[in-house]
Structure formats: structure tokens, C-alpha cells
């Protein structure tokens, strides 16, 4: 036995241990689900490695997990004969959290125990869940293929440190011994453990065994009766030990599907919906796909691992096979079991593979179909999905041209039709309500729902009763750049150049607009002269009814929201000059037109321009100059 080393836990592990003990006390039994799940994963990994290195089995290919309790000692032991760990592996896996964004996870914790419990569940506590019920944990492990004297013992009381030393262990795999806290001794009971295994681990594909005591022989109790022979004690599987996805859908209960989801995702909450399908023919595969009910805390972390579990002919191959699911569906959990891929498939082979491409196409359509069905049959439940994952789905049109129309049908927006901030309006809803003669879908993108709903750009459209989609999420401008039409109707921004009302604008309105332009030629010329190159163009508009002026993007120019998006991404963008539109019917513009003092005229023109820019962009390059100018004009008006 080698000398013992003492190591300190990574700071995040200390925080997690403390959190679990205080936040998960109402759901303590999940420690067994997590540890049995990890043990089954270790068996799966050995089965895969042994495909090319049969010697790793060391003559024992019967993979299993064993759970036992010692009520006198107050211990629970979870043992597997899976892949095992080396000394370095033990220090890495049992002393740190190798997840990116961990610091961000801890920032998200609120102190509300029920909410934090959900977050911790999403984070995936795994091995550390042992400390929910134990005040000391001992791990004895030997990696498959290593000598007996290369085994390792890890031990910790969960208080900041752990010890590691080499030991001798004849059998491969990992043994975890939980020394239960005094108040948790209820778990040192075979009956209690058996009930938890039956509840949480029935779906696990390796046997989860517990010791069954033998029975003594019994003599015949009556004439003609048969004597009952003695039975020896033996290990007996407590679960079905068949891969859940290989069973017929009709034989699997909702509870089993839900527990299997928790097994593969390590989420504590039930999934929102799932789809289990077996496909035979040109390609043979089974998919089991889940939509979670809550977005994971690190959904927007670029380094977050995502993807499906990959099995080939029921043999586990890899986690997080992102090649089967597009990025905009990265929230989908589940697995795919292919009969056509080679067992020795690697991530590199998956990258450029016709089978992978075909499977990706099929499961993508399957997920979109699930969502279409949900949106149609249960709009309320779909709203739950949209609130959690809508922004991610909006990445779809840019990423998946083949399914652009399907994705567009799943999008939801706020709208002037509902006057609510909730995103409940689909593009199909909008098209159904379009006015006679309307050929475009009108929308506005702004910094907030309030800014969009109160934008002066909506004034004429509101007056005419034309619905406008209100967009205020950062990704919306990006979405619209890749979704130019829906159902043959072009999407048109109300903040861009001409409103293009087409048949919605009658001959009298066109005539009135032309008359206004003619009458305002002098005003337009004067304003352009005083503003100079601050604007690309000055014109009069009929789009405004209550506001004196607005700015719009010129034809072919980037909108203010797109410029903000590019700048936020760190790209240098030269801001284009806006088109400045005046409402000649507004009292302030009429006042401007009658001003003879050129200096005062220039100040009024500048004030109206900056007001319009503030309304459009939500900020100004030099707000203090704007305030000085406004104060100057206010003082002049009270003299």
C-alpha cells in the first residue's frame, strides 16, 4: 500500500456539497439513482472498450451493479464490475467539476431552496449526491486491464479535503461505501434500497442486484404434500435489465419513460414530452427523444456539451453525439441506436458519414413534428415550451434551410392584435387575419416590448387596423435576416424606408401624400441644409399621426437593431446615416416651418432629429449635448 496523499476539493465542489446537503434534503433518495446510474454507465463503457480489447473483461463478461446494506455498521455499498478508474482519474473525477460555466451556475442560485433544487438537478450532481446521506464516503476502484496493486482508495468526509492511496483490489470496477449520517440510517435497509431501485432504476440495461438470503429445507406439512428443498443465498436482479428503448412502446409506462429521461439527463424534473420510434427498412434504428420541461442553466454556453447518446446495436458508444441534432435543437435529450453504423465509430467518422446525415435528417424532422403536434393539440403546453426554448428555435431558419418553413410555423411573437407581451401569435395566425389587399407581414424590432409597442412607426398602421408583429429579443434581427417570407408573404419592417402598403393605400391617400411633398419642398430643403451629413435624406411622411418626426433605415442599409447586434458580437460596424422623416401635420413641425431665425431653426431641427434617434435606438452618442439643447429650447419658450 502506498503512502496516503491529501488533496483539497476544487472551490466549486465545496460549494456544491454545501448546497446539496441544504437544498436536496426533501429528495434524499436520489443519491441511489445517481450512483446506480453512474455504475451502469461504467459497465456500458467497459462493454464498448472490450469490443476491441476483449482482455479487459478479465474472464468476467457478466456486467452488473450490486447494492448492499449493513445495518450494524450503518453503510450502503454500490459496487460495479465496469471500467474502473486509475489514480489520476480518481483525483480528476472525484475532486473537481469538469464543466464549463460552473461559476455562472453558482451565480444563478437564488437562495430559494425549491428553485435551487431544480437548478442543482439540471447541473447534474452525480457522484457528489452521496454526501446528501453520508458523512463519509469511501471509494475503492481498479481500472480494467490494470494490476491488482494499482487499485486506488479515495476517502472524504465532504468537508474540503479528500485522501487518495494505492491499495490491492483483485476485482476490477468501483465500490462506493457510504457511511450514513445518524439521521439517515433508514437507508441501511434492504427493503428501503430495493424499493428505491425498483422506483428509479428499472430501465437500466445492466442487472442491478441485491443479495437474496437462502431458505432452509421444509418438510412436507401434510400427507401427499411435497417437501421444499433448501435454497442458497444468491444475488438477484431487482430490475428488468433490458434496454428500455428496445421494448415495444405499448409495454413501457409513462413513469418508466420519465425515469429513463432522468437517468440519461440527470434532470430532476419530468420531461415535457417524448417520442419513441423504431424504423426498419433501408435504415434500421431506434430513437427515443425528449423535450425537457425546463431550459438547462447553461443553454447559452458555447462550450456546453450537447447531443444524443449513441448506441450501435444496443452497445453504448458515446455521449453527446452532437452530429445527430442541429444546434438550434441542442436542448433535445435522448438516444439513437443504429444497426447500420460500425461499432468502432468515432466522432471523426460521424462527421462525414451518409448514415449520420440520414439519421440527423430523420430525427430533426421527428422533433419538429413533435413540436408541430404539441402546438396544434395543446397550445398551452406549447407556450411552456416556447417560454423555455423559443429563442433557441429562432436560430433555426439561419441554420436549417431545408426545414425553414416548418420552423417558421413554430415561431411565436407578440403582436398589436393582442396588446400583450406574451409571445402567442404564430405567422399562420397573422396571415389568417391579414386585411383584404394586404400582401406583406409587417413587423418591428426594438430593444424592449414597450419600445416596440409604443414606437411612432406603428401610428399609421394602428389607425388603419393593420396588425404588426412586435419583436424585442436580441436574436430577432438575426432571425428576420434569414426569414424573408412566410406562406408567400414577404416580411417587411415598419422602420425601413417606404411602408409599401400597396392596395391598403387608396388613391386619395396617395394624392394627399404627393400634395404634402410638394407643399413641404421648402421645409425639407432647409432641414437638409442645416443637418448636413448627419442624415442621408430628409422627407415628409404619412406614417406618423401623433409624432413630429422619426428616423428610418435607408434601402439596403442595416437597421439600428442589426448594428447593435453586430457591435455586441465585437464587430466593428460603421453606423449608416438615417433617413429623417417629418410629419408636416404636427404642430412642432409647423412651428419649425414658420421659424425665420436660421439659428433657432437649426436648433429645432437638431432637437427633432435627436428625439427621433432616441426613440429609435434607445440611446444617443452624446446625451449631455441633447439635454443642453433641450434645456436651451425650453428656457427660450418660457421667456
From Swiss-Prot:
Pfam families given in the database record: HATPase_c_3 (PF13589), HSP90 (PF00183)
Keyword annotations from UniProtKB, A to Z: ATP-binding, Chaperone, Cytoplasm, Nucleotide-binding, Stress response
Gene3D superfamilies in the record: 3.30.230.80, 3.40.50.11260, Heat shock protein 90, C-terminal domain, Histidine kinase-like ATPase, C-terminal domain
GO CC list: cytoplasm
Coiled-coil regions, chain positions: none
Alphabetized InterPro entries for the sequence: HATPase_C_sf, Heat_shock_protein_90_CS, HSP90_C, Hsp90_fam, Hsp90_N, Ribosomal_Su5_D2-typ_SF
Region (C) location: 565-639
Intrachain disulfide bonds: none
Domain of life (superkingdom): Bacteria
SUPFAM superfamilies, per database record: ATPase domain of HSP90 chaperone/DNA topoisomerase II/histidine kinase, HSP90 C-terminal domain, Ribosomal protein S5 domain 2-like
Annotated compartments: Cytoplasm
Quaternary data: Homodimer.
Family: Belongs to the heat shock protein 90 family.
Function: Molecular chaperone. Has ATPase activity.
Protein name: Chaperone protein HtpG
Organism whose genome encodes this protein: Shewanella loihica (strain ATCC BAA-1088 / PV-4)
Amino acid at each position: 500500500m502506498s503512502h496516503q496523499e491529501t488533496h483539497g476539493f476544487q472551490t466549486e465542489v465545496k460549494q456544491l456539497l454545501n448546497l446539496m446537503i441544504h437544498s436536496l434534503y426533501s429528495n434524499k433518495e436520489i443519491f441511489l439513482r445517481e450512483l446506480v446510474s453512474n455504475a451502469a454507465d461504467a459497465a456500458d463503457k467497459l462493454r464498448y472498450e472490450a469490443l476491441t480489447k476483449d482482455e479487459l473483461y478479465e474472464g468476467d463478461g457478466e456486467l452488473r451493479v450490486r447494492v448492499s446494506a449493513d445495518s450494524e455498521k450503518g453503510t450502503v455499498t454500490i459496487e460495479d464490475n465496469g471500467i474502473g478508474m486509475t489514480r489520476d482519474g480518481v483525483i480528476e473525477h472525484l475532486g473537481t467539476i469538469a464543466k464549463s460555466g460552473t461559476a455562472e451556475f453558482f451565480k444563478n442560485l437564488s437562495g430559494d431552496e425549491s428553485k435551487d433544487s431544480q437548478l442543482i438537478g439540471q447541473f447534474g450532481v452525480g457522484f457528489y449526491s452521496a454526501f446528501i446521506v453520508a458523512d463519509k464516503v469511501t471509494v475503492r476502484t481498479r481500472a480494467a486491464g490494470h494490476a491488482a496493486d494499482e487499485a486506488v482508495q479515495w476517502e472524504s468526509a465532504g468537508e474540503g479535503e479528500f485522501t487518495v492511496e494505492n491499495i490491492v483490489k483483485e476485482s476490477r470496477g468501483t465500490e462506493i461505501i457510504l457511511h450514513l449520517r445518524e439521521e439517515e440510517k433508514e437507508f441501511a435497509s434492504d427493503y428501503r434500497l430495493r424499493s428505491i431501485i425498483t422506483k428509479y432504476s428499472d430501465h437500466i440495461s445492466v442487472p442491478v442486484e441485491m443479495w437474496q438470503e437462502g431458505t432452509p429445507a421444509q418438510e412436507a406439512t401434510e400427507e401427499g404434500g411435497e417437501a421444499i428443498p433448501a435454497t442458497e443465498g444468491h444475488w438477484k436482479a431487482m430490475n428488468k435489465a433490458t434496454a428500455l428503448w428496445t421494448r415495444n412502446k405499448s409495454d413501457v409506462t409513462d413513469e418508466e419513460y420519465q425515469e429513463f429521461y432522468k437517468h440519461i439527463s440527470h434532470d430532476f424534473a419530468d420531461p415535457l414530452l417524448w417520442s419513441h420510434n423504431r424504423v426498419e427498412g433501408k435504415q434500421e434504428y431506434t430513437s427515443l427523444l425528449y423535450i425537457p420541461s425546463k431550459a438547462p442553466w447553461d443553454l447559452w454556453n458555447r462550450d456546453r456539451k450537447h447531443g444524443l447518446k449513441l448506441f450501435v446495436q444496443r452497445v453504448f458508444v458515446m455521449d453527446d453525439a452532437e452530429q445527430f441534432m442541429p444546434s438550434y435543437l441542442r436542448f433535445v435529450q435522448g438516444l439513437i441506436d443504429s444497426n447500420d453504423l460500425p461499432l468502432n465509430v468515432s466522432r471523426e467518422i460521424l462527421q462525414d458519414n451518409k448514415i449520420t446525415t440520414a439519421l440527423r435528417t430523420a430525427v430533426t424532422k421527428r422533433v419538429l413534428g413533435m413540436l408541430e403536434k404539441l402546438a396544434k393539440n395543446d397550445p398551452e403546453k406549447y407556450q411552456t415550451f416556447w417560454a423555455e426554448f423559443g429563442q433557441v428555435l429562432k436560430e433555426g431558419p439561419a441554420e436549417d434551410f431545408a426545414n425553414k418553413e416548418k420552423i417558421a410555423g413554430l415561431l411565436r411573437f407578440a403582436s398589436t392584435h393582442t396588446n400583450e407581451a406574451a409571445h402567442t401569435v404564430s405567422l399562420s395566425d397573422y396571415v389568417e387575419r391579414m386585411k383584404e389587399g394586404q400582401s406583406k407581414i409587417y413587423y418591428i424590432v426594438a430593444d424592449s416590448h414597450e419600445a416596440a409597442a409604443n414606437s411612432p412607426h406603428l401610428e399609421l398602421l394602428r389607425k388603419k387596423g393593420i396588425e404588426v408583429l412586435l419583436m424585442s429579443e436580441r436574436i430577432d434581427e438575426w432571425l428576420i435576416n434569414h426569414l424573408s417570407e412566410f406562406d408567400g408573404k414577404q416580411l417587411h419592417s415598419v422602420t425601413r424606408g417606404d411602408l409599401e402598403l400597396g392596395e391598403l393605400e387608396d388613391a386619395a391617400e396617395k394624392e394627399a401624400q404627393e400634395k404634402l411633398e410638394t407643399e413641404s419642398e421648402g421645409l425639407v430643403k432647409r432641414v437638409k441644409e442645416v443637418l448636413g451629413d448627419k442624415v442621408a435624406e430628409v422627407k415628409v411622411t404619412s406614417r406618423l399621426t401623433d409624432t413630429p418626426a422619426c428616423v428610418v433605415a435607408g434601402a439596403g442599409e442595416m437597421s439600428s437593431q442589426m448594428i447593435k447586434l453586430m457591435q455586441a458580437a465585437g464587430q466593428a460596424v460603421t453606423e449608416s446615416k438615417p433617413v429623417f422623416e417629418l410629419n408636416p401635420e404636427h404642430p412642432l413641425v409647423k412651428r419649425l416651418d414658420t421659424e425665420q431665425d436660421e439659428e433657432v431653426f437649426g436648433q429645432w431641427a437638431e432637437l427633432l432629429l435627436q428625439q427621433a434617434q432616441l426613440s429609435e435606438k434607445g440611446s444617443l452618442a452624446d446625451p449631455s449635448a441633447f439635454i443642453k439643447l433641450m434645456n436651451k429650447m425650453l428656457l427660450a419658450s418660457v421667456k
